């Protein structure tokens, strides 16, 4: 939950920035409905010869995917990864739902939207980064006020894998 604070501090030298908690979300494997390959871990992608749709190299979920593979003692080159990367989580889930891939790493809500199986592998905090002076301005305050409404909370609850109980909490207040 705090792995990004040092990156913000390093990148914001001379800038007054505030990091605001938005939500916690689950990242994991989006799997074909019913999980026909019986995938129960990231290691099963290789063992079960799953066709994997990955995100583009610069996507945060691709960086996380490569990290999770390394933790499991494997790498992307060991997998059957589709040539064309997914440009977003909806694209990734669509390819799995159409049978073009067996699995891919994305947020739980992408799997939920397409009625696919989901294997949670990582929980991460999603934050907003704003300049300190902007935090106190009307647009940011209106966004935070809207995000505290019942309608917003209901919509967040409908999106599987998101938790927003601490939304708006300042988790970093730059130098």
Task: Name each region found by the language model.
Residues 1-35:
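N-terminal segment of the mature folded domain
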Residues 1-8, 93-122:
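A ligand-binding cleft/hinge motif common to bilobed small-molecule-binding domains
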Residues 6-16, 37-43, 49, 150-175:
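N-terminal hydrophobic or amphipathic helices and topogenic motifs
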Residues 26, 116-145, 166-172:
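Periplasmic-binding protein-like
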Residues 34-40, 134-139:
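Short helix-loop capping/hinge motifs at secondary-structure junctions, enriched
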Residues 43-63:
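Short loop->beta-strand "edge-of-pocket" segments that line small-molecule binding or catalytic clefts
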Residues 45, 65, 93-97:
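Hydrophobic residues within well-ordered alpha-helices
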Residues 75-88:
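Short beta-strand-to-loop elements that line the ligand-binding cleft
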